[in-house]
């Protein structure tokens, strides 16, 4: 009797923690692949580092970094790292950002401003990739300081994280009794 019960339990599929992330269709864009070397007393050990932006083009975006001995595994590791670092971005009806924002991280500084419908993404480098994968279609962005692709992508994520919607501002500003 107990053996039958154990067999039935083995057949049941347990829900996984990240199953809902696998259902959504994510877009992965490779920003950079670089060959890196670790020098030891035995010689040089080559490996590859991949920087990937992952998002659903509907308000979710993340940046991931992966390192492995071959390019394919580095890309896979970067994708899983990007899925772990997903953030939600508020997008307006005109597929822009709600307000102007400045992202600051290390030596990188990024200024983003909303733009009118039809203007497109006016940005360069990694910032453009992050905005496109997030699903933002009309925005103006300027990157200042460092031109490092990984740092600029992370700074763009910091800037997008600091965006707030009108409802969030109302909740912060007013007491619950007023709303």
Curated annotation (Swiss-Prot):
A matching Pfam family: Ribosomal_S5
Gene Ontology CC annotations of this record: chloroplast; mitochondrial small ribosomal subunit
Primary residence: plastid
Keyword flag Nuclease: no
Superkingdom of origin organism: Eukaryota
Subcellular location: Plastid, Chloroplast
Record-annotated S5 DRBM domain positions: 26-89
Keyword vocabulary terms for this entry: Chloroplast, Plastid, Ribonucleoprotein, Ribosomal protein, RNA-binding, rRNA-binding
A GO BP entry: translation
Any GO MF annotation of the entry: rRNA binding
Quaternary structure note: Part of the 30S ribosomal subunit. Contacts protein S4.
HAMAP family listed in its UniProt record: Ribosomal_uS5_B
Role description: With S4 and S12 plays an important role in translational accuracy.
Domain remark from Swiss-Prot or TrEMBL: The N-terminal domain interacts with the head of the 30S subunit; the C-terminal domain interacts with the body and contacts protein S4. The interaction surface between S4 and S5 is involved in control of translational fidelity.
Family in the record: Belongs to the universal ribosomal protein uS5 family.
UniProt-recorded name of the protein: Small ribosomal subunit protein uS5c
């Amino acid at each position: 009797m107990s053996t039958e019960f154990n067999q039935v339990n083995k057949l049941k599929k347990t829900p996984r923690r990240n199953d809902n992330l696998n259902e959504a269709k994510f877009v992965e864009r490779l920003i950079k692949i670089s060959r890196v070397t670790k020098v030891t007393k035995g010689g040089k050990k080559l490996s590859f580092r991949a920087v990937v932006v992952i998002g659903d083009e509907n308000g979710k975006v993340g940046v991931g970094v992966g390192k492995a001995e071959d390019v394919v595994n580095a890309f896979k590791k970067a994708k899983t790292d990007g899925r772990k670092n997903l953030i939600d971005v508020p997008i307006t009806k005109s597929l822009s950002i709600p307000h102007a924002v400045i992202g600051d991280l290390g030596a990188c500084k990024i200024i983003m401003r909303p733009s009118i419908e039809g203007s497109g993404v006016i940005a360069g480098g990694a910032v453009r990739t992050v905005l496109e994968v997030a699903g933002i279609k009309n925005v103006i962005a300027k990157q200042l300081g460092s031109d490092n692709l990984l740092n600029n992508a992370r700074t763009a994520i910091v800037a997008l994280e600091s965006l707030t919607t009108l409802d969030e501002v109302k909740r912060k500003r007013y007491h619950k009794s007023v709303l």
